[in-house]
Regions:
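Short, small-residue-biased leader/transition segments that mark boundaries at the very start
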Residues: 1-8
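Cysteine endopeptidase catalytic domains of the caspase/legumain-like
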Residues: 9-287
Length: 287
């Protein structure tokens, strides 16, 4: 199904896959913009961070990348406070930031994903074939690429596909879920299809922009994006939601763009696979 209808590839026919035992979780959260006008990107990533912490992730299993120029910004009337809804919780509370966005290049994200430590990258994903990996990216996008600050073609689908294939060869994950809130994001993640055990959900297809959500007239900024706010609503209500049901709810509630799912045929049955494997999994290493 294409066009204005839901687009999910073969999910109803996908069989079950034989995955290794699930013993741990990792997360990489990235806001790829800075400055007050882009408030929503960092706010959304911090809101996801709070969801993971509440679900039992420890900070050593979350790599958080934001510019951190919002909470104490001169334009912020409530210093030290970042929210995704008017009057909502402070998603900046007790955060542990691993890297400022401006201290990295987009390609550093690939090294972090692939566990490549260096003097400039002391903290990386150290996952194994028994770990599920959740990646959430929020920022700007252009056709065929995701932006890094003001660099428009900073991260392409080929860039991600190359490192994902290497991660698969090295058995650096059990399952990987990557969600992208960016304009034209579908065109990037579509290039990553064909890799076993990975699922990609994007806020928009490859030909359209994604949409902001919740405008704060006093602060003169958008506080969130529609895709992310819907995602947070869904996992707050039910952290065990099936992937197919999550996609359906994202699709019907994300007005103005078409939420897309890619690589379902290489992931498994989306009716039985669910978010608890990424957002609500309890074990001795991440709780």
């Amino acid at each position: 199904l294409v066009g204005s209808e839901m687009c999910i590839r073969d999910s109803n026919n996908s069989g079950e896959f034989n995955y290794p035992a699930h013993t741990g979780n990792w997360a990489l959260l990235v806001a790829s913009s800075k400055e007050w006008t882009n408030y929503r990107h960092q706010a959304d990533v911090l809101a996801i961070y709070q969801q993971l912490r509440q679900a039992g992730y420890t900070d050593d299993r979350i790599i958080l990348i934001v510019e951190d120029d919002i909470a104490d910004n001169v334009s912020n009337p409530n210093k030290g406070v970042i929210q995704v809804t008017i009057g909502g919780n402070n998603v900046y509370e007790n955060v542990e930031i691993d890297y400022r966005m401006s201290s990295l290049k987009a390609k550093d994200i690939l090294a972090i994903l692939n566990g490549e430590k260096s003097e400039s990258l002391p903290t990386v994903i150290e996952s194994t074939e028994n770990d599920n990996l959740f990646v959430f990216w929020s920022g700007h996008g252009v056709p065929g690429a995701m932006c890094w600050d003001e660099e428009p073609y900073a991260m392409t689908g080929d860039d991600l596909s190359t490192v994902f294939k290497d991660m698969n060869l090295k058995r650096r994950y059990r399952k990987l879920l990557m969600m992208v809130e960016a304009c034209f994001s579908g065109g990037v993640m579509e290039q990553c299809e064909g890799i076993p055990g990975m699922l990609f959900i994007t806020a928009a297809n490859g030909d359209e922009t994604s949409k902001a959500d919740v405008f704060n007239g006093e602060m003169k900024v958008w506080m969130s994006n529609r895709f992310t706010s819907t995602f947070i609503e869904q996992i707050t209500d039910n952290k065990d939601v099936a992937m197919r049901d999550l996609y359906y709810r994202l699709f019907i509630n994300t007005v103005g763009s078409h939420v897309m799912v890619y690589n379902a045929e290489n992931y498994g049955n989306l009716y039985s696979a669910n978010m608890s494997e990424f957002i609500n999994f309890k074990n001795d290493k991440s709780k």
